[in-house]
Amino acid sequence: MTAILPSTAATVNTGFLHFDCVGKTFPTPRGPYVAIEDVNLSVQQGEFICVIGHSGCGKSTLLNLVSGFSQPTSGGVYLDGQPIQEPGPDRMVVFQNYSLLPWKSARDNIALAVKAARPHLSTSEQRQVVDHHLELVGLTEAQHKRPDQLSGGMKQRVAIARALSIRPEVLILDEPFGALDAITKEELQEELLNIWEEARPTVLMITHDIDEALFLADRVVMMTNGPAATIGEVLEIPFDRPREREAVVEDPRYAQLRTEALDFLYRRFAHDDD
Ligand SMILES: Nc1ncnc2c1ncn2[C@@H]1O[C@H](COP(=O)(O)OP(=O)(O)OP(=O)(O)O)[C@@H](O)[C@H]1O
């Protein structure tokens, strides 16, 4: 006997965040431009994914589909089985350029987000959330400064604290440390891992830095070049957590994974512009 099942046409149950044959084509004056094509990936809840690939390969295009700022032209992107159709507080984006409100203090930038996204919390609970997140990123002392009174690293700390204070299910990071000096960058990578361990959002992060990806991610997704870019290879990163940078870098598997990534990017999918 054949059982009659409810229709599942609108839902997909593979992975928490699921890319199913995703394509995105942009109309241009010279005709349609196929940016990405046939992207398939299943991300588990709480997983940390880094996406690397050459400039213009479609990394931001992919992230915009997850944030809901744009829609795929073929296939679908699903969160918890539901197609992503618009932006929402369950998915927060942190950009390279901080995007803080310039006239508000660090504290108020975070407080406003908490107020808007978690209105069910009492005023004192909201205050506690803000205090906690300022502390997590080491900005308790500097909380009353405005963005123009903060360093680049401090601004990015505020942006990360603001995103996480909303308790998003998915944290989307678009090259968040790209503009920072090497030391600040390493500090923030470590802070990000500490915060991620606490809240465990699913993370999707674009980076151009192979070492950053190997230190942070559970899996590194490497994209081929466009047009019609797709996922070329996925590296599983085996290092135990919590991670210590020295232990990771000294692990013999680190050099091997690094060589694989370099080989992918600079030999198999070399790009003239890089
Ligand atoms: N709105 C648009 N209209 C036309 N083409 C677009 C549009 N947005 C992106 N593209 C093209 O799609 C391709 C992918 O762009 P995308 O910004 O996703 O790349 P990226 O990998 O994030 O690049 P980068 O590392 O330089 O930020 C590029 O060739 C880009 O020119």
Curated annotation (Swiss-Prot):
GO cellular component terms, A-Z: plasma membrane
Organism in which the protein naturally occurs: Synechococcus elongatus (strain ATCC 33912 / PCC 7942 / FACHB-805) (Anacystis nidulans R2)
Entry keyword Membrane: yes
Membrane-topology descriptor: Peripheral membrane protein
Signal peptide: none
GO molecular function annotation: ABC-type nitrate transporter activity; ATP binding; ATP hydrolysis activity
GO biological process: nitrate assimilation
PROSITE patterns, alphabetized: ABC_TRANSPORTER_1, ABC_TRANSPORTER_2
Location in the cell: Cell inner membrane
Protein name (Swiss-Prot/TrEMBL): Nitrate import ATP-binding protein NrtD
Family annotation (InterPro entries): AAA+_ATPase, ABC_transporter-like_ATP-bd, ABC_transporter-like_CS, ABC_transporter_ATP-bind, NO3_transporter_ATP-bd-like, P-loop_NTPase
Residues noted as binding ATP in the record, renumbered to the chain: 53-60
PANTHER family xref list: NITRATE ABC TRANSPORTER ATP-BINDING PROTEIN, TAURINE IMPORT ATP-BINDING PROTEIN-RELATED
Short name of one Pfam family: ABC_tran
Assembly information from the UniProt record: The complex is composed of two ATP-binding proteins (NrtC and NrtD), two transmembrane proteins (NrtB) and a solute-binding protein (NrtA).
